[in-house]
C-alpha cells in the first residue's frame, strides 16, 4: 500500500451521487492521477492518501485511492496555495500571498481565532475579513457533515443537500427527528428517514414516525392516480406500513390537519383525506378552467362560410362532427374533442390550424410525450413540442422545492409571470395529462387564449394523479365534440375496425384472415415467449419493414411468467446477447448492456442532453429526460462510471451509475407505459390475470398502439373476457365536483 501526500491540483471528474472522483495530485514527485470515492474534496486541498498503483489501458498509471485524509496546510507555501486556489470566494493568488506574507505559518490560527486582524492586510476590509473567516469555518463544518451523514447510508449528493438545508442543525435533526427531512429535503422520503431513525434508536411508536408514516402513505397513493384517500383506507394502509394498530394512529390524522398538511372533507362515501398540496391543486385547476371557458362573439353564418372556404383551400373533406368541432373551437375558450382511431382527429386538428392561421392567430401544438409530439408534427406539418418543452422546464436544482412528490410543479420557465404568447393552444393525447401537468400548463396560459384538447377518452388514464380529461367531460361544463365516424381509409385497417369493436364490447373475429391483426393461440407461458421471440427476430421485421428494436412487446403486468421483468431478461439474451465488445453494468438484479433498448421511468429535470455531429461537435443541448422516453445504450464507461443513452432525435444523455435505477430494459413494457406512443408493430402476450386490471380499456389501449400490425399470443378466451370487462381501477378524484361548484 502506497502512502502519498500532495495537493489537489485539478478535479477532472466527479460523480456527485456516489463521490467517485478523478483528480490530479501535485506532490514532490510531480503530478499523479488519482481515482476513488471521496465524501468531499476541493482543488487546493492538502491530502494524505493510501492506495495502490494501477495501469489503466487508456489513461495510464493512476493511484487507486483506498483511504484519504484532509490536512490543514502548515508551511507558508501550502497555506498560500490553498487560500489562492479559489476555495475561498474573493481570495485570489495575489491576496493569498499578502495574507501569508503578513501572518506566515500562523495564518489559519489568525483566521479562526482573531479574524478581525485580517483587516491589517491591504485590500481586506473588516467586512471582508469576517466573510473569509466565515467561509473557512463553513468549509470545515461541511467537511465534517459530509463524513458524518454517509454513515447513515446517505449519498454524497443527498448529504450536501441536507447540510445546505439544515447547516449545523443537521446533527440535532438526525438525533431527534430525522422524519422532518422527508418534508423539507428533496430526495429524502419516509423510508430513508425511517432507516436513519432506526439507527439512532428512535422508537417505532414515536409521534414523529406515525405522523410521517401516515402522510407518506397518503402521498404514495398518488402513484396509483389518487388525489385523496378515504380515512379508513388511509389508516389501514398506514398501520400496515408502520406495524402499529389502527386505533393507535387515528388521532394523528387530525394532528396533520391542524398542521395544514392534509385537508379533511366529508362526503357521501366517507371522510376524504387530501394532502393540502393536491386539494388546492384541484381547486386551482378548476378555477383556471372556469376562467378560460368564455364564449366568443361569432356570427354563425359567417363562421360556416369561412369553414367551407378553408375546406376548399386546404382540400379537406370534413363531416358534420368535424365541422362542428372547428366551429366550437372558434366559439369557445375551451373545447374537448374525443374519438377513437380512424375517426378523423388529425384532420380536425389540421382544419383548426388552417382556420386560425387564416385569422392571423399564433398557434402552439403540444403533446405529453416526445413520440406523441413527433407524430403530431408529422401529421400536421407544424412543429409540435412536448408540454414540458413548451413550458420551458427548468433544470435548476433550486426548482426542486417547487415540484411535488411526483416531479411536477412550478419549476417551469413559462408560468403566470411569464405566460405563453399564443392565441390558440392545441394539446393532443390529452388522456395522458395528469393533474400536476395540467396545473403547470394552465398557469402559463393567458386569459383569452383558446385551449383545445384532443384525446381518446377510452384509453387508460394518465400515469400520474388525477383523470383530468374524464373529469372535465364528466363535469358537463365544457363543450365536447365526439368523433365517431370511421373513415373509408381507416375501415381498411382491421386494427382500427377491431379497436372500435373492442370499444363497443363486440366480439372480435380471430380467424387470422386479416392483413394486420393476428391471434396465435397458445397456453404455455414458455411456448408463448418462444413465439414472441420468433416474431420479433424473424417474422415481423420483414412484414412491417422495421428493425426488431422498433417492434414493441406490450404486456399487462410487471411480475409473473409474462411480466415485463421476466420478458426483458429473456428478450435481452436474444436481441442483444453478450459479447466481448459490449460493456455491461449490473444494477440490482438487472443487467444493462451496450446496445440495450431502455426506458426512462421517472421525470428527471436536471439530466443534460446534447445532440452531436459524427465528429463530436455539439449542435443542440438542453435539460430534462422524462418518464416513458425510450432509447438505446450507446456506451458504458467504467472509468467515468457513466452510461450514455441515445434518445429520439439523436439526443444523448450521460447517466452516472448512481441514478441507473431511473432506467429499465424496454424490449417489453407495460401497456400503461405505452400510452401516447405508436409502433410499427406490437406483440401482446396474454394469459389469465387479475380482473380489475385485465379490462376493456387496457386491451383497447394496447391494440391502438400499433400502426401496421397487431399480434396477440396466448388465450383467446382471456382476450374476449377483457373486451366484456368494463370495470376500471378506481381513481379517487374530485375535479369534476370542483368544476361544477364554480359553474
Residue ranges and their predicted role:
Residues 1-305, 743:
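Accessory, non-ATPase domains that flank or precede helicase/AAA+ motor cores in DNA-metabolism machines
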Residues 315-331:
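N-terminal pre-P-loop "Q-motif" helix
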Residues 328, 355, 359-361, 370-374, ...:
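Conserved helicase motor core of SF1/SF2 NTP-dependent helicases
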Residues 337, 365:
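Hydrophobic anchor at the beta1->P-loop junction of P-loop NTPases
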Residues 345:
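Conserved lysine of the Walker
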Residues 348, 352:
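Hydrophobic positions on the alpha1 helix immediately C-terminal to the Walker A/P-loop
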Residues 457-623, 742:
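Conserved helicase motor core of P-loop NTPases
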Residues 627-743:
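C-terminal accessory regions
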Amino acid at each position: 500500500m502506497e502512502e502519498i501526500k500532495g495537493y489537489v491540483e485539478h478535479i477532472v471528474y466527479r460523480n456527485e451521487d456516489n463521490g467517485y472522483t478523478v483528480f490530479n495530485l501535485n506532490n514532490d514527485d510531480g503530478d499523479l492521477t488519482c481515482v476513488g470515492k471521496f465524501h468531499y474534496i476541493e482543488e487546493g486541498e492538502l491530502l494524505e492518501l493510501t492506495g495502490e498503483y494501477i495501469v489503466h489501458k487508456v489513461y495510464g498509471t493512476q493511484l487507486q485511492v483506498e483511504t484519504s485524509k484532509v490536512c490543514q496546510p502548515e508551511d507558508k507555501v501550502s497555506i498560500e496555495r490553498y487560500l489562492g486556489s479559489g476555495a475561498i470566494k474573493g481570495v485570489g493568488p495575489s491576496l493569498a500571498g499578502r495574507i501569508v506574507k503578513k501572518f506566515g505559518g500562523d495564518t489559519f490560527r489568525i483566521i479562526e481565532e482573531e479574524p478581525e486582524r485580517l483587516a491589517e492586510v491591504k485590500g481586506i476590509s473588516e467586512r471582508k475579513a469576517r466573510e473569509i473567516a466565515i467561509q473557512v469555518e463553513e468549509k470545515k463544518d461541511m467537511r465534517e457533515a459530509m463524513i458524518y451523514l454517509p454513515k447513515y447510508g446517505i449519498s454524497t449528493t443527498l448529504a450536501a443537500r441536507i447540510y445546505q438545508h439544515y447547516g449545523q442543525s443537521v446533527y440535532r435533526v438526525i438525533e431527534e427527528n430525522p422524519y422532518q427531512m422527508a418534508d423539507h429535503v428533496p430526495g429524502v422520503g419516509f423510508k430513508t428517514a425511517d432507516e436513519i431513525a432506526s439507527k439512532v434508536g428512535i422508537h417505532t411508536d414515536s409521534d414523529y414516525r406515525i405522523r410521517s408514516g401516515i402522510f407518506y402513505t397518503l402521498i404514495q397513493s398518488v402513484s396509483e392516480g389518487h388525489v385523496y384517500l378515504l380515512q379508513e383506507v388511509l389508516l389501514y394502509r398506514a398501520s400496515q406500513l408502520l406495524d402499529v394498530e389502527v386505533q393507535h394512529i387515528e388521532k394523528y390524522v387530525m394532528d396533520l390537519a391542524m398542521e395544514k398538511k392534509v385537508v379533511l372533507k366529508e362526503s357521501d362515501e366517507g371522510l376524504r383525506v387530501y394532502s393540502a398540496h393536491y386539494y388546492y391543486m384541484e381547486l386551482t385547476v378548476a378555477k383556471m378552467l372556469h376562467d378560460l371557458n368564455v364564449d366568443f362573439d361569432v356570427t354563425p353564418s359567417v363562421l360556416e362560410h369561412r369553414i367551407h372556404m378553408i375546406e376548399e383551400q386546404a382540400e379537406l373533406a370534413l363531416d358534420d362532427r368535424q365541422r362542428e368541432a372547428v366551429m366550437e373551437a372558434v366559439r369557445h375558450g375551451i373545447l374537448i374533442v374525443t374519438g377513437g382511431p380512424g375517426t378523423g382527429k388529425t384532420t380536425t386538428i389540421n382544419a383548426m390550424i388552417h382556420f386560425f392561421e387564416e385569422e392571423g392567430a399564433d398557434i402552439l401544438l403540444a403533446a405529453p410525450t416526445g413520440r406523441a409530439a413527433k407524430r403530431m408534427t408529422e401529421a400536421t406539418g407544424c412543429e409540435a413540442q412536448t408540454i414540458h418543452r413548451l413550458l420551458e422546464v427548468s433544470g435548476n436544482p433550486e426548482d426542486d422545492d417547487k415540484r411535488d412528490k411526483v416531479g411536477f410543479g412550478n419549476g417551469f420557465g413559462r408560468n403566470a409571470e411569464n405566460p405563453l404568447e399564443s392565441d390558440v393552444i392545441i394539446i393532443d393525447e390529452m388522456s395522458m395529462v395528469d393533474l400536476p401537468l395540467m396545473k403547470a400548463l394552465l398557469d402559463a396560459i393567458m386569459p383569452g387564449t383558446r385551449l383545445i384538447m384532443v384525446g381518446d377518452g377510452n384509453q387508460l388514464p394518465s400515469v400520474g394523479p388525477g383523470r383530468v380529461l374524464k373529469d372535465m367531460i364528466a363535469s358537463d361544463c365544457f363543450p365536447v365534440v365526439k368523433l365517431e365516424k370511421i373513415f373509408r381509409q381507416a375501415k381498411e385497417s382491421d386494427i382500427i375496425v377491431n379497436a372500435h369493436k373492442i370499444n363497443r364490447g363486440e366480439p372480435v373475429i380471430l380467424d387470422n384472415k386479416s392483413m394486420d391483426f393476428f391471434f396465435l393461440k397458445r397456453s404455455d407461458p414458455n411456448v408463448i415467449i418462444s413465439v414472441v421471440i420468433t416474431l420479433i427476430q424473424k417474422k415481423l421485421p420483414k412484414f412491417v419493414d422495421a428493425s426488431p428494436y422498433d417492434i414493441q412487446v406490450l404486456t399487462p403486468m410487471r411480475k409473473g411468467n409474462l411480466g415485463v421483468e421476466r420478458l426483458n431478461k429473456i428478450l435481452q439474451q436474444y436481441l442483444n446477447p453478450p459479447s466481448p465488445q459490449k460493456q455491461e453494468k449490473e444494477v440490482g438484479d438487472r443487467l444493462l448492456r451496450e446496445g440495450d433498448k431502455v426506458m426512462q421511468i421517472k421525470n428527471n429535470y436536471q439530466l443534460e442532453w446534447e445532440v452531436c455531429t459524427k465528429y463530436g461537435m455539439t449542435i443542440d443541448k438542453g435539460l430534462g429526460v422524462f418518464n416513458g422516453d425510450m432509447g438505446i445504450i450507446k456506451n458504458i464507461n467504467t472509468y467515468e462510471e457513466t452510461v450514455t443513452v441515445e434518445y429520439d432525435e439523436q439526443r444523448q444523455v450521460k447517466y452516472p451509475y448512481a441514478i441507473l435505477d431511473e432506467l429499465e430494459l424496454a424490449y417489453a413494457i407495460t401497456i400503461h407505459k405505452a400510452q401516447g406512443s405508436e409502433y410499427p408493430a406490437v406483440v401482446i402476450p396474454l394469459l389469465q390475470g387479475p380482473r380489475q386490471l385485465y379490462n376493456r380499456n387496457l386491451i383497447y389501449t394496447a391494440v391502438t398502439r400499433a400502426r401496421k400490425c397487431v399480434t396477440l399470443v396466448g388465450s383467446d378466451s382471456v382476450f374476449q373476457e377483457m373486451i366484456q370487462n368494463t370495470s376500471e381501477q378506481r381513481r379517487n378524484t374530485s375535479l369534476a365536483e370542483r368544476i361544477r361548484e364554480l359553474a
